[in-house]
């Protein structure tokens, strides 16, 4: 067999892949099936198997598409998947590269309902702390519903029967179909912006989940939550629960029930007024009877029979109390005065004037002591000075001259020996009262 009769696995796989790539029916296709082996990668990619009763195929949805899904894919879900079929060359298998995914049929609505309910609950839109109280006696009741349905007739009839004082404003809105969500949201905003009423009833009669779906839309739920006017939700029958029921300030099982919650019953109010009137009449009678008994008791009392004597007794009691008070006050004043004197005595040494006086006394004493000490020291110094002066005088040449001695100088040099002079030397003789200029005629004494 020639080599041309054979192809490689790679070549065949590439050939098949090209066939898939150029087929317009496989490039963008919707496939219905059941999810199986769903695995969500850490990077956000979703790998799964799409199957029915007779076949299965591998599929992948990359993170950029998976991030847009309004729900979390799980095994067992019936879904519609949109994407393209391509061949994965390494394994030779074909697989679906998914771009969109939607739950199948009614199951999709239930899934979307649960997903939105979970989302809004996590944001706190259902929390009781945000619920506004329904006014007890509203003057104006607003009704957002279809103007031609049975629901609006039931609400109007019930309010007129129960509480004719309330004015009813019907804000007509679409309650099913493609434009119902926008219509309901606009009516809620209009009622708030124009402050049309004291309480709002938002709802409709019963129907299938598809017909009631506008009240499960996120936009309607958020408009109800944002409303400043308290809202009563009344959608469908008693067993029907919508997202609007959870975000509303109060939920009614039916439109008729909403009307009963919105306004009080005039009959009930009349009965309540009658009951209050009976209780008030009985209370007034009881209080009047008790007051009459107290008055009779007072009239028969000692004070009414002998008022002057009672006055005299009270005056005596007042005098006694006044005397005790005066004595106690005097005693307290004396105690306070004694305490003040003691405090004054203790504080006197601390008074600046007293401290200044004491400082002056200390200064005078210290000055006197300093003067005495200085006098003693001066006397001692004077005595020492006289002693030193006497010694100095004893050594003073002038003092020696006073006793008849003189000093001889040769050219300003004191002559202490005859050996310092020669015959005919000129000498200066200093005496106590002057000097003599002499010439040596002869010298006597021992020569050195």
Curated annotation (Swiss-Prot):
Transmembrane segments: none annotated. It comes from the Bacteria. Bidirectionally degrades single-stranded DNA into large acid-insoluble oligonucleotides, which are then degraded further into small acid-soluble oligonucleotides. NCBIfam families: xseA. HAMAP family: Exonuc_7_L. Belongs to the XseA family. This is Exodeoxyribonuclease 7 large subunit.
